[in-house]
């Protein structure tokens, strides 16, 4: 429910929700859809990639809702986003040709291609092994360092040490809201992990 509200899929039943200075509660469904497509990037646990399309085509999708962006510009931005997440060599690969970590990188590229005000990540490392999870956390920390707002939902308490602010919910209520003054580096944690055997 919280992510549906934050993602402009639902409106709050009470109170106000402002996204990038705009009140969401009073908006029409179509206005929320436009806001969602231009201001919010989504990253899901199960990637939500279209199976028979290439990485570039998947990343282009959010830009298709903006008539001011030409197809050439769409492709250019999608390629840049994929290069930024380390997939410049997988542009034409389809989902069945990529690992879970690569698919999640495509999902992150798709989330940032619109330069959104906020990125919502729902259990974004939930389906990944430890090493790949930390590779994804490194990307999120880099995006945050660039000034992006990221709301990362997780049930894994070990991940809170890598974020700047932690809010714990129980039964829809905030039970803890704390600032992390000692944010751990996901890159350092990744570097300390044993290398996979096929890399040695």
Language model segments and positions:
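ABC family nucleotide-binding domain
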Residues: 1-162, 166
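A cytosolic small-molecule/anion-sensing beta-strand core signal
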Residues: 170
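Conserved beta-strand-loop-alpha-helix hinge in the C-terminal portion
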Residues: 173-199
